[in-house]
């Protein structure tokens, strides 16, 4: 049985601590999960699609009594005996699979959900229930790890500390969505892979949820930019959902690994990614024209009329935002005067993203045929500067102002007055 230790303040008699001091064994819940994509090969880390057989199932339910009813971040929990059971109804993420229920038990406490490379859609290891699919395991791992990262920057956010449902293997193809409360993913077909087996698609749809539940409590415009940043900053890969376009060819040719077709990001012609079969590539240098997509130069000419920035379609019009965010962590913060390594640059980028995007309304202003600017109070550039500030005043610049200027430089070529002011602040700050 339990042995209890009580710590009492000798002066006041107050109980300071009351705890079980037995040393229990530890057990773990693991399962096979696709890392970035589900292409079944791993040519480079940023396009790795081989199932990882023993991925931890973070914060999974255990079927045990509290306080051991949920595993920790590594899928590990304290075990005193009896059967452990998980349904992937976790502390923060709950999986619901259209293929069926998930239910895996172990009399020894250790639960291995299994799964092997090449299993897709409703295929299972033959145990753990018909919902023990690659999509459910991959989604449970990735969504938990992304939300855990976000809690590190926004510990008081109520949505991040509540449970979110992810619906997997829905009977449709070539898409995924956030519906205001849940994230939802489709099985393979129509020339596309299962969107519930692609890490960046998980992260993107979760990003809409974060956008909807941050400080402002409403989606920014374009929320597609926000969601893409969540994905590319988490995975440190510019291609959003490599492997999405499996056999669907938009005229841009096959990727180097031969597992899919490059995405065409233009709505009015061809604007091809050179090695990305996902839905977008945030690195402008990996596009056929090898040039940044600015608001006036690209969005106004390549995107259809709609409700996004510049009055254009929201996914297409988010190109300058996602490219600026990628530039920040891969070019500006790694160059002089900062010279950060990649890991440090992404840490800075994630801080700015999570702590600086909560009150973004319109990421940047833009009127096609006229001008574009990012200097509005609720524009992304100004909000990220505020998050970067270290003394309560933007008048003397911020620690990374010259790098954050990447959020501005891709938006327009017509904001000379603003640029002069910002560059003067930058020079003073980094000198």
Which residues does each predicted region cover?
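Zymogen propeptides/activation segments of proteases
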Residues: 1-202, 206-431
């Amino acid at each position: 049985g339990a042995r209890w230790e009580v710590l009492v303040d000798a002066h006041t008699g107050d109980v300071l601590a009351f705890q079980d001091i037995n040393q229990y064994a530890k057990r773990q819940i693991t399962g096979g999960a696709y890392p970035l994509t589900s292409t079944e090969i791993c040519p480079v880390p940023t396009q790795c699609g081989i199932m990882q057989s023993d991925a931890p199932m973070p914060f999974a339910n255990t079927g045990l009594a509290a306080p051991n009813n949920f595993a920790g971040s590594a899928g590990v929990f304290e075990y005193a005996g009896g059967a452990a059971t998980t349904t992937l109804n976790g502390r923060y993420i709950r999986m619901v699979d259209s293929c069926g229920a998930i239910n895996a038990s172990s009399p020894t406490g250790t639960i291995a959900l299994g799964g092997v490379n090449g299993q897709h859609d409703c295929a299972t290891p033959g145990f753990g229930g018909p919902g023990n699919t690659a999509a459910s395991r991959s989604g449970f791992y990735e969504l938990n790890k992304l939300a855990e990262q976000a809690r590190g920057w926004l510990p008081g956010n109520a949505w991040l500390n509540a449970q979110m449902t992810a619906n997997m293997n829905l009977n449709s193809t070539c898409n995924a969505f956030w519906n205001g409360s849940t994230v939802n993913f489709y099985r393979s077909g129509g020339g596309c892979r299962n969107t519930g087996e692609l890490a960046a698609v998980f992260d993107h749809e979760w990003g809409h949820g974060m956008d909807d539940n941050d400080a402002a409590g409403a989606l920014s415009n374009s929320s597609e930019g926000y969601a893409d940043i969540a994905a590319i900053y988490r995975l440190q890969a510019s291609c959003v959902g490599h492997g999405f376009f499996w056999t669907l060819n938009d005229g841009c040719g096959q990727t180097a690994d031969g597992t899919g077709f490059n995405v065409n990001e233009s709505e009015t012609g061809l604007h091809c990614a050179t090695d990305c079969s996902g839905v977008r590539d945030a690195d402008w240098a990996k596009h056929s024209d090898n040039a940044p997509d600015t608001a006036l130069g690209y969005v106004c000419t390549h995107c259809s009329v709609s409700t996004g920035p510049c009055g254009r379609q929201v996914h297409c019009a988010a190109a300058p935002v996602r490219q600026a965010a990628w530039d920040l962590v891969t070019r500006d913060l790694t160059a002089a005067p900062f010279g950060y390594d990649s890991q440090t640059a992404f840490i800075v980028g994630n801080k700015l993203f999570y702590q600086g995007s909560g009150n973004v309304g319109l990421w940047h202003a833009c009127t096609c045929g006229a001008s574009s600017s990012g200097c509005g109070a609720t524009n992304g550039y100004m909000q990220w500067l505020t998050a970067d500030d270290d003394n309560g005043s933007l008048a003397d610049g911020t620690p990374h102002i010259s790098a954050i200027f990447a959020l501005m430089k891709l938006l327009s070529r017509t904001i000379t007055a603003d640029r002069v002011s910002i560059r003067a602040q930058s020079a003073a700050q980094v000198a």
